[in-house]
C-alpha cells in the first residue's frame, strides 16, 4: 500500500502496465519530456525511452488518428489530449474510426486505445481549458467513457481501460489531481468498467455524481445530515455504459433521485440518467427527479467559475428542497 494522489495513481497505473506489456506506448503534447501539462506522465520517458513515450505536435487529429492506426496494428496506445476542450480537431477520428472500427470490420479489427483527457473545471482557466464534455463521448456507440473520483478508482479504472479491447475515453478530473491522498495497493488491480459505486448508504434520496463533483456532493451531504436527511451517494464511475442496476436499486429504495454534474444542462448526461429512472422506476418515485448542473453557457472567466460549477452549499439547498417534496 502507498498513500498517493489521484495524479500519482494514474502515473503508477501507466508505469506498471508499460513494465508488463511492451506493446503499450504513451504520447501527446508535452507528454514525453515534460510529463504532460499536469506532469501526469512524469518520469516515464526517462524510464522507457523516447520510442515508447514521446511528444507530438500540437495536432489533436494526428494524435487520435495515430492512436487508431497503432491500435489496429497491434500496439496499445495511451494518447493524451492536454484538455478535453481541445478534442475537437481529433473528434472525427475518434468517432468515425476508433468507435466504429469493430462494427465496420465485423470484428476483424479492434481498437484497444485509451484517450486520456484532463476534464472539467476547478483551475480557473478559460473556456476550453475547463469544459466538461462527457456528452460528446457518452453518446457515441462503440466508446466507453470512465472517470475516477479517488486515487484508488483512478488506478483500477485506468488499468481496466488499458486492457479493454475497445477504445476507452478516460476523463481525469483535474481539479482533484492533487487534492487529496488515499491508500492505493502497490500491485496491479482492475475496477470493472460499467460498474458504479455506492459511496454512502442512505434512505431518503439517491444522488448520483461522478469525477470531482462526488466530493462536492459528499460535502453537501455533511451539511444536511444534522437536519435528519439521509442521502445515498452513488459515484457513477462509468459514464458509458451506465450501470442501470445500481442506480435503479437505489431509487427503488429511496424513492427520490437527483443528479449533480458540472456538465451543461441541455442534452447532457443528467437528462439521460433522469430519463432512464423515469422509464424504469417511475412508480417507485415519490417526487420528480432533480438535476443540478452547470449553466448552458461557455465556461466563464476565473472570477465566475465559482458560480458556474455546483458548490456544496447550493447542492445542499437542492437536497433540502427534494427532501421536502411530496407526491
UniProtKB/Swiss-Prot annotation:
Enzyme Commission number(s): 1.2.4.1
Required cofactor names: thiamine diphosphate
Keywords, ordered alphabetically: Oxidoreductase, Pyruvate, Thiamine pyrophosphate
InterPro entries: THDP-binding, Transketo_C/PFOR_II, Transketolase-like_Pyr-bd, Transketolase_C
Class of the enzyme per the UniProt entry, highest EC level: oxidoreductase
Binding annotation for thiamine diphosphate: 60
GO molecular function, one term: pyruvate dehydrogenase (acetyl-transferring) activity
Pfam families, sorted: Transket_pyr, Transketolase_C
Reactions mediated catalytically: N(6)-[(R)-lipoyl]-L-lysyl-[protein] + pyruvate + H(+) = N(6)-[(R)-S(8)-acetyldihydrolipoyl]-L-lysyl-[protein] + CO2
Keyword Oxidoreductase: yes
Keyword Oxidoreductase: yes
Oligomeric and partner information: Heterodimer of an alpha and a beta chain.
Functional note: The pyruvate dehydrogenase complex catalyzes the overall conversion of pyruvate to acetyl-CoA and CO(2). It contains multiple copies of three enzymatic components: pyruvate dehydrogenase (E1), dihydrolipoamide acetyltransferase (E2) and lipoamide dehydrogenase (E3).
Protein known as: Pyruvate dehydrogenase E1 component subunit beta
Gene assigned in the entry: pdhB
Amino acid at each position: 500500500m502507498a498513500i498517493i494522489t489521484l495524479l500519482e495513481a494514474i502515473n503508477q497505473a501507466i508505469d506498471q502496465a508499460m513494465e508488463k506489456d511492451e506493446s503499450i506506448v504513451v504520447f501527446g503534447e508535452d507528454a514525453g519530456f515534460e510529463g504532460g501539462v499536469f506532469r501526469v506522465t512524469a518520469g516515464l520517458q526517462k524510464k522507457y525511452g523516447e520510442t515508447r513515450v514521446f511528444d507530438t505536435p500540437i495536432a489533436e487529429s494526428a494524435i487520435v488518428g495515430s492512436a487508431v492506426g497503432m491500435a489496429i496494428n497491434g500496439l496499445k496506445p495511451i494518447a493524451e489530449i492536454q484538455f478535453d476542450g481541445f478534442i475537437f480537431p481529433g473528434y472525427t477520428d475518434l468517432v468515425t474510426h476508433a468507435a466504429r472500427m469493430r462494427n465496420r470490420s465485423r470484428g476483424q479489427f479492434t481498437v484497444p486505445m485509451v484517450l486520456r483527457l484532463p476534464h472539467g473545471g476547478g483551475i480557473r482557466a478559460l473556456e476550453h481549458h475547463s469544459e466538461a464534455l462527457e456528452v460528446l463521448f457518452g453518446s457515441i456507440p462503440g466508446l466507453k467513457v470512465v472517470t475516477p473520483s479517488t486515487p484508488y478508482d483512478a488506478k483500477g479504472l485506468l488499468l481496466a481501460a488499458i486492457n479493454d479491447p475497445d477504445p476507452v475515453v478516460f476523463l481525469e478530473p483535474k481539479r482533484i489531481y492533487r487534492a487529496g491522498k488515499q491508500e492505493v495497493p502497490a500491485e496491479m488491480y482492475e475496477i470493472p468498467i460499467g460498474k458504479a459505486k455506492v459511496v454512502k448508504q442512505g434512505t431518503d434520496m439517491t444522488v448520483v455524481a461522478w469525477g470531482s463533483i462526488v466530493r462536492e456532493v459528499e460535502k453537501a451531504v455533511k451539511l444536511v445530515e444534522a437536519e435528519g436527511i439521509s442521502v445515498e451517494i452513488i459515484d457513477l464511475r462509468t459514464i458509458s455504459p451506465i450501470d442501470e442496476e445500481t442506480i435503479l436499486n437505489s431509487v427503488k429504495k429511496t424513492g427520490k433521485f437527483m443528479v449533480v454534474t458540472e456538465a451543461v444542462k441541455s442534452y447532457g448526461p443528467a437528462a439521460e440518467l433522469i430519463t432512464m429512472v423515469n422509464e424504469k422506476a417511475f412508480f417507485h418515485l415519490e417526487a420528480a427527479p432533480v438535476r443540478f448542473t452547470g449553466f448552458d453557457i461557455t465556461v466563464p472567466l476565473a472570477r465566475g467559475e465559482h458560480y458556474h460549477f455546483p458548490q456544496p452549499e447550493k447542492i445542499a439547498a437542492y437536497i433540502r428542497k427534494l427532501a421536502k417534496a411530496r407526491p
